Regions:
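Residues embedded in well-ordered beta-strands
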Residues: 40-42, 48, 66, 113, ...
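Short secondary-structure boundary segments
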Residues: 22-23, 45, 117-120, 143
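A late-sequence structural motif
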Residues: 129-170
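Short beta-strand-centered segments that line the small-molecule binding cleft or hinge
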Residues: 2-43, 56, 79, 103, ...
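Short loop->beta-strand "edge-of-pocket" segments that line small-molecule binding or catalytic clefts
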Residues: 39, 48, 55-75, 168
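Secondary-structure junction motif
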Residues: 65-87, 153-157, 161-162
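C-terminal regulatory/effector modules of DNA-binding transcriptional regulators
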Residues: 93-125
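Short beta-strand-to-loop elements that line the ligand-binding cleft
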Residues: 1-2, 21-22, 89-99
Length: 170
């Protein structure tokens, strides 16, 4: 569900909690970081970037990117934009995609390089795509728990949040 829809639902009381990859959600929504995941790059097999064991960020400026759809994955896209901000020029975006499968298909076909959370590597095992880490420690995406500031949560939601907190370090 897009971030904007989640925020509308949280503000209207339709939702008690939500999840996002950005903490930029407004003052009326509380954010709590739950877990962190490294970002890695998906590179076509036989690509010049494969000469690096860890891909330097500035090297990505020379190649087209396959990025997530900014409306469907708004929070994730914001964090990717923040990560790419140090590049000296606007990245060349070959395509925006609405699924991991489509991104991997386009990367495997040589259309560009994509980004994946490290926890999703197992879902990306394909002969035409190679995964490489980024050569930077700050290439991390955080998943946040969202909840309205003024809302008393149902007991079931409180229990669910307690379980998330227990397992957030795993």
């Amino acid at each position: 569900m897009p971030l904007a829809e989640q925020l509308r639902g949280l503000r209207s009381g339709d939702f008690s909690i939500g999840f996002a990859h950005t903490a930029e959600v407004g003052d009326d929504i509380l954010t709590e970081p739950l877990w962190h995941d490294s970002l890695v790059v998906a590179v076509p097999a036989r690509h010049p970037l494969l000469s690096h064991k860890a891909v330097p960020l500035h090297q990505l400026a020379s190649y087209p990117l396959v990025l997530c759809d900014p409306q469907v994955y708004e929070g994730y896209y914001r964090e990717l934009a923040r990560l790419l901000r140090p590049l000296e020029r606007q990245p060349d975006v070959a395509e925006h995609v609405s699924s991991l499968d489509m991104m991997l298909t386009l990367v495997g076909a040589g259309y560009g390089v994509g980004f994946i959370r490290a926890s999703r590597i197992a879902a990306t095992l394909r002969p035409d795509v190679v995964i490489r880490p980024l050569a930077m420690d700050s290439a991390v995406i955080t998943t946040y728990l969202l909840r309205p500031v003024s809302e008393d949560l149902p007991v079931s939601a409180e229990r669910f949040i307690a379980r998330l907190r227990e397992h957030s370090g795993d």
